[in-house]
């Protein structure tokens, strides 16, 4: 069932519930009881009778924000019939159609006098509601705030950067779980290490679901774009749009052939094009004749995740830096105590395999002990290849329309694509492949895919581990950094942390996806948004008063 038809069905159900629970109230207002059953028009009458802006009705059935607006409209209607106490408001919010039905079928219900101007004067609650609705509209339908808690894109994007993500440029993806709390991605809160993440309270209603549908955009994901997408291996959330959001660089797009040789990335047989704003990082071992003053190093070079390895047999002090740019490497080499700076490159032919933690053994031994169970989400993709993060491929990125010849050898590469991403049933039995019960050795790809990698190449969980990112999972393009706070998130891969919290003003309201080293400033946009946010009601009242005076 397509998106619009499914959504129309939900609107019809809500309209029937509205009609059943309020038709007598509409009759008391002087309208036909049938009006209560008519989508949009029923709420239009509520706004008209309660003397509120009638254009608000267009928001009644919007995904996410519609829940807020309908609740507000229900409160208006109940107030019109004298149900305005705190308890009655709570019942209207929590049990809307049940409580309104109780009022509807009560014998003593009557219409109260029209609102006085004093009754509708601005309150803290009213201002808060306006702010929530405005922010929800922006967050849901155009620019979504996104914070960076990890260092996979260092130093192109920094831990503590907060971005505005343009959800329109690649085509707006309509919400797939329209009944949800605003501003929350997947869960309301984390129940902790002992709890199963799948049992955490969700911020959305899973039962109310809509199919995938993307509106046309004005751009496609280009090679080297920085992209926000939903993490494909998120097993906690079924809905695509509720999976965790990741930000990486699209190093390869549909149809490209990717290969990594000795830590160097090649696309279609050529060395990758490094964008002007990209600061690629790799991991290094640094040997020093005496202990390094890491806190002082931070003052000159900024925060660098580092782990002390102790002394080697030569008496040298070894430090593991999980991410250094080529420029930082040269600066560290100039430190008098530094003896050598050696890149950490994995051996060719050694497969990257991750195992789950053996919790009981780790507690008993007091150290990290791996179990025998393989963590496929953090192991190399595809699992049947002897690849690792530094020696990878060649791998072709699937493109819409590609006809794949399926073999036992390449099934691990395409199984998730065929089943999870494109909704088919795949079986391998008797030496043959069956898709949806039919024997075949061919499959036609239904959508484009992308290969995402972090600029901090050795500290990034990316497509080398979770595989292709389908078009359905694309959220949008980061537009600019609206705030940046150093030290906001701790780095569990470092023995040292940033010294306190401080704003990085030089990064605020700067473009994040231009490909140029010199970032454009968006302070002008910040001024416009703040003026709209805080000044909307003021301007509305000002022009309304002027109109009345004229």
Language-model features: locations:
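Membrane-cytosol interface at the C-terminal ends of transmembrane alpha helices
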Residues: 12-112, 142
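Extended hydrophobic leader/signal-anchor segments used for secretion and membrane insertion
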Residues: 114-550
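Feature marks short, highly hydrophobic, charge-poor N-terminal signal-anchor/signal peptide-like helices
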Residues: 1-9
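Short, flexible segments with low predicted structural confidence
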Residues: 9-10, 17-18, 125-129
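N-terminal low-hydrophobic presequence detector
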Residues: 2, 18, 59-60, 252, ...
